[in-house]
């Protein structure tokens, strides 16, 4: 009942509109001396989160406009119709949660307050009447009902309550807590007090609870304040803090400090952030150290304070005792972001967040409903509290990589060729890529052209024959994605090839034959006979006759001797007269002069002594003493010395002409 007005007090009827509603609401307020202010209207209208406007005649456009009322002392104006009219426009994202969300209902909070005060006359059945408890929808994500125990009086939030191991819905979540025998709870609480508390704060597991009562939002959830302290004309910050379960709370406010002069910080408020340093991921000592550094810097400080709604001061003596017994886990960033997103979604659907007082969800349609077992729920709960183990993160990364590989389309000629080359360069591609030897020269990480053609036919979706595969391989060679060992420009199946630069990793592209484990890598050498030069042609072989074998003699020159004639001696690898792999260097030029039925190094008219093939040295061939001109032969050059013997025991024949008796010649047989 409204108190009677005095002589200087009068009642004024005010009509107000909420948002876009056309039907006004009426409220009777008291005004002194006939002057009504916004503060008088707020005394009767207790909802917050609105902007207030009144109609006023604008002299410029000669029409009524809506003028915002910002302070409580602003006077209410009459419209042209002679009535007091106020237009209320809701503020988007006001507070931290939509109006249809909350925590515990008022009877439930009352029960928990009585438990904290250890009252002997506790009413154990406040939920017996189902009509008194509003319907509450709880999103039952895996392990989330365990987190709800964090709001109880238990000092061990990780204790698993057997009464909550169920998958019921609606308003039955808190019923076992209220209907339990209080003597047993007190004994359990006293035993748990002896256990060592967790020193670091735990991550918050958010839960979504929708209630039909609006008072639970206004009085149950904290308000976040941003307080700016200039620190100019004050001697110190004047703030003492304490840590409770990893959270930072104000324990004392010193007089004449910046906090006392501001007046908005009270004992028991939680400090969430100082300047740009958030306390959500810091331990208690780290947060206190950050606060001490900010206070000693003598610079302006911005505090983010969480103020919990409490009852009258007479209900309890120490505010910190209440905070210690009821530590509410809070993730402010996720909280605010979720609230704004839900509000915007409701507006997009044409729903008014302020008018949604209840949410009805059919059975089995909860978006995060989980049918996991108790062990799975406990595992998921531990992961969300303590973080996901490294092994699970690596397994998830491997699974994601495998899924991405499955999404890659099949290898075709239309995709980037470098993808094809990298696919064949993988260790499990099926292409034989390994270290090989050719003419005692190490060819690291090479493969044969024939194997490449086979791989393309097997793995390319649009290549079905070897001819098309050879054409595609030639394109890879021309693009530089694969390279010939001796820089040939045409592709053949009988040559060695290596990958281009950047295809193989550093661990596989290295020329070092030592593996990562410290052992020597096995190098494969070709088992086929490798000729330095070509065998004798068929016509020349017929002239040799008598089953006289010929052999190739090499010199003592270094295999890396400089030779400038390789450009004109490069031939195709597929010559039928040459060996498959040795033909990369070209054919040999056989210099011979038939004398009788065997080959000699000189004739009768040549009086210069020619050394035996086994005695030919680089100096004798270079200065022309060997009787053969041209550049010095090497094992990789085409100018070689050929000696044939009529004796099958591999004897080298050399005619040594005596200068004194030119008519008599003698043959000396040198055994090689």
Curated annotation (Swiss-Prot):
What SMART domains does the entry give?
DAX, DEP, PDZ
Recorded phenotype for the gene knockout or disruption: Embryonic and larval cell fate, polarity, division and migration defects. In several lineages of the developing gonad 42.6% of hermaphrodites do not have either one or both distal tip cells, which results in the absence of the corresponding gonad arm, and germline proliferation defects in the male germ line. Defects in hypodermal morphogenesis including disorganized dorsal cell intercalation, eventually resulting in 2-fold stage arrest, and failed ventral enclosure in some worms.
Which InterPro entries does this one have? DEP_dom, DIX, DIX_dom_sf, Dsh/Dvl-rel, PDZ, PDZ_sf, Ubiquitin-like_domsf, WH-like_DNA-bd_sf
Q: What processes in GO biological process is this protein linked to?
A: canonical Wnt signaling pathway; cell fate determination; cell fate specification involved in pattern specification; cell migration; embryonic digestive tract morphogenesis; embryonic morphogenesis; endodermal cell fate specification; epidermis morphogenesis
Decide whether keyword Calcium is in the record: no
Listed A to Z, the keywords are: Cell junction, Cell membrane, Cytoplasm, Developmental protein, Membrane, Wnt signaling pathway
Q: Where is this region: Disordered?
A: 97-127, 150-174, 187-215, 604-672
The chain's coiled-coil residues are none
| Comp. bias (Basic and acidic residues) | 160-169
Location of the PDZ domain = 226-294
Q: Which SUPFAM superfamilies match?
A: PDZ domain-like, Ubiquitin-like, Winged helix' DNA-binding domain
Which ranges carry the DEP domain?
Answer: 427-501
Task: Specify the DIX domain's residue ranges.
Answer: 9-91
In which compartments does the protein localize?
Answer: Cytoplasm, Cell cortex; Cell membrane; Cell junction; Cytoplasm
Compositionally biased spans, kind Basic residues: 191-202
Q: Where is the composition biased (Polar residues)?
A: 98-108, 660-672
Q: Which Gene3D superfamilies match?
A: 2.30.42.10, 2.40.240.130, Winged helix-like DNA-binding domain superfamily/Winged helix DNA-binding domain
For the keyword Cytoplasm, the answer is yes
Q: Cite the GO molecular-function annotations of the record.
A: frizzled binding; signaling adaptor activity
* Cellular component GO terms, alphabetical: anchoring junction; cell cortex; cytoplasm; cytosol; plasma membrane
Instruction: Name the family.
Output: Belongs to the DSH family.
Give the function comment from the record.
Plays a role in the signal transduction pathways mediated by multiple Wnt genes. Functions redundantly with other dishevelled family members throughout development. During embryonic and larval development, controls cell migration and/or cell fate specification of hypodermal cells, hypodermal seam cells, vulval precursor cells and, through distal tip cell migration, somatic gonad precursor cells.
What domain comment accompanies this record? The DEP domain is required for cell membrane localization.
Write the protein's name.
Answer: Segment polarity protein dishevelled homolog mig-5
Q: Which gene holds the coding sequence for this protein?
A: mig-5
């Amino acid at each position: 009942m409204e108190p009677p007005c005095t002589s200087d007090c009068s009642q004024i009827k005010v009509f107000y509109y909420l948002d876009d509603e056309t039907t006004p609401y009426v409220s009777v307020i008291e005004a002194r001396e006939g002057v009504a202010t916004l503060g008088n209207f707020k005394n009767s209208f207790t909802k917050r989160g609105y902007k207030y406007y009144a109609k006023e005649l604008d002299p410029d456009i000669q029409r009524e406009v809506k003028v915002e009322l910002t302070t409580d002392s602003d006077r209410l104006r009459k419209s042209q119709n002679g009535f007091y009219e106020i237009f209320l426009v809701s503020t988007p994202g006001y507070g931290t949660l939509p109006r249809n969300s909350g925590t515990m209902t008022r009877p439930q909070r009352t029960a928990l307050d009585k438990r904290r005060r250890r009252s002997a006359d506790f009413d154990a059945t406040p939920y017996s009447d189902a009509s008194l408890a509003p319907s509450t929808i709880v999103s039952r994500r895996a392990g989330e009902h365990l987190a709800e125990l964090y709001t109880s009086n238990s000092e061990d939030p990780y204790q698993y309550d057997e009464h909550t191991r169920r998958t019921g819905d609606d308003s039955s979540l808190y019923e076992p807590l209220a209907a339990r025998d209080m003597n047993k709870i007190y004994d359990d609480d006293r035993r748990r007090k002896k256990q060592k508390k967790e020193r670091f704060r735990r991550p918050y597991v958010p839960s979504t609870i929708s209630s039909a009562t609006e008072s639970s939002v206004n009085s149950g959830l904290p308000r976040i304040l941003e307080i700016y302290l200039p620190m100019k004309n004050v001697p110190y910050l004047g703030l003492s803090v304490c840590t409770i379960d990893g959270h930072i709370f104000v324990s004392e406010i010193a007089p004449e400090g910046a906090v006392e002069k501001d007046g908005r910080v009270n004992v028991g408020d939680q400090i969430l952030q100082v300047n740009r340093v958030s306390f959500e991921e810091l331990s208690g000592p780290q947060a206190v150290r950050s606060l001490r550094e900010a206070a000693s810097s003598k610079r302006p400080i911005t505090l983010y304070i969480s103020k919990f709604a409490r009852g009258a001061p007479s209900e309890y003596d120490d505010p910190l005792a209440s905070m210690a017994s009821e530590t509410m886990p809070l993730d402010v960033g996720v909280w605010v972001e979720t609230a704004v997103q839900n509000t915007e979604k409701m507006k997009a659907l044409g729903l008014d967040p302020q008018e949604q007082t209840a949410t009805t969800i059919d059975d089995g349609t909860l978006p995060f409903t989980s049918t996991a077992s108790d062990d799975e729920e406990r595992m998921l709960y531990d992961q969300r509290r303590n973080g996901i183990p490294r092994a699970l993160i690596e397994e998830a990364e491997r699974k994601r990589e495998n899924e991405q590989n499955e999404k890659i389309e099949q290898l075709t000629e239309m995709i980037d060729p470098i993808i094809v080359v990298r696919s064949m360069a993988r260790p499990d591609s099926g292409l034989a890529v390994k270290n090989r030897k050719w003419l005692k020269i190490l060819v690291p990480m090479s493969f044969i052209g024939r194997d490449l053609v086979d791989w393309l036919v097997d793995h390319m979706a649009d290549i079905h024959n070897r001819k098309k595969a050879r054409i595609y391989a030639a394109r890879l060679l021309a693009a530089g994605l694969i390279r010939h060992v001796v820089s040939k420009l045409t592709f053949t199946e009988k040559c060695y090839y290596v990958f281009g630069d950047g295809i193989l990793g550093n661990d596989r592209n290295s020329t070092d034959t030592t593996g990562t484990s410290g052992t020597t890598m096995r190098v494969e050498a070709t088992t086929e006979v490798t000729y330095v030069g070509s065998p004798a042609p068929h016509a020349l072989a017929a002239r040799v006759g008598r089953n006289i074998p010929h052999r190739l003699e090499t010199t003592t020159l270094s295999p890396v001797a400089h030779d400038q004639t390789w450009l004109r001696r490069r031939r195709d690898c597929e010559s039928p007269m040459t060996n498959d792999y040795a033909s990369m260097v070209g054919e040999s030029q056989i210099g011979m002069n038939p004398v009788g039925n065997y080959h000699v190094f000189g004739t009768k008219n040549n009086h210069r002594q020619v050394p035996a093939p086994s005695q030919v040295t680089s100096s004798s061939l270079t200065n022309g003493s060997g009787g053969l001109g041209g550049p010095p032969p090497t094992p990789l050059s085409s100018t070689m010395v050929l000696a044939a013997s009529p004796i099958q025991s591999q004897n080298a024949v050399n005619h040594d002409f005596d200068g004194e008796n030119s008519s008599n010649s003698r043959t000396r047989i040198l055994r090689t």
